[in-house]
Amino acid sequence: MNIINLEGFRQIPANEGLCENYYSTNIISALNENGVTLINDMSGSVTSVCRGTQAVNTVERTGLIFTTPSYVTLYSTLPDLKASAVQLGFRLTLSAGKKYSSSPSHIRINGYSFTTPYPDEAASYYYEIFATRNENGYVSASLYCNRSLAGNTSFYVSDDRTDKIQVSIGSGDNIFSSGASGTLMLGDMYCGTVAYGKNNSAEPALLGAIEVRYSPVTAFTGGSAKNSLDKDIVTGLNTSDSDAGYLMLSPSPEAAQVTFGAVDNSNGDLVAVMAAVTYRSADAPNNCLAWSVKSGSHEGETVTENDVQADTNSWTTVSQSFTTQPDGDIPFTEGEIIFATELYNQPTTSRQ
């Protein structure tokens, strides 16, 4: 499996309201500004949203917490199923409280539901959905809970809709009994692709559960860059709040280098690493972002974001993911690993 996206929400400040008014459009806009791409739509009624930690059976879980008096549904659009099979994993935690239904459907794919019962006490389960599409256009999807098969479904999808299939997480009905509020927490997400074999056959590569950690920026170098408010660049890079300012990257052949905090792989259990850049495009319409990721002497290719439709009024996130060292098939070394990115603001015709 090739893991292409990771999301643990830990880059969002803890225990602070995500936005001022909890309308769906405001919440999605705030998630975009924080670089979240695995959740691209939502519906429902919520009274608060924050990144926080909850203890379930003495185990602390971290994620994005939605407080709701009724229901909330989060949507994740899958990669094109015509190109590969897809596996999506996430942890879904519901707080203690009388549940509205004894046989609810908290997870759906393309509108087709799986039964996912939760007890009245707090509970946290790790789910993985594996989906394939055969040559006749029929999608088969299986849901696994803590590695055990929880359900199957199938449906037809035309060729022009294979990149529009959504997984919905949450419920369109009340989650808790009438008149009661509770919390839904989503965390530790990943999305991966699995290559098709003969006749579009593919098998899941279940992980069971993962923990997505976060490495903040620890250092910055680059003489052609500055903070938009003339404040500390490192603080600005670690903060989505505009009060800390943003990095302004001037056109230059010189790379600006961002170094991240060490990744702990002392147990050799590192599955994947993702570096992401959230940015607004340059005022100059013929310029774009180019960037690479490296770890020590292992440096990946420079990616030029020529085709990204970013603008100066909204935030766009691009990412690079690795299941081995950035320059090839060399496994991650055990111990601490330090990653860095090199950033360029340059004409779109350069570094092709």
Name what the model sees in each region.
Residues M1-M42, G187-S228:
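Extracellular carbohydrate-recognition regions
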Residues S84-A96, N267-A282:
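A short beta-strand element within beta-rich, extracytoplasmic domains
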Residues Y127-S154:
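Carbohydrate-binding surfaces in secreted/extracellular proteins
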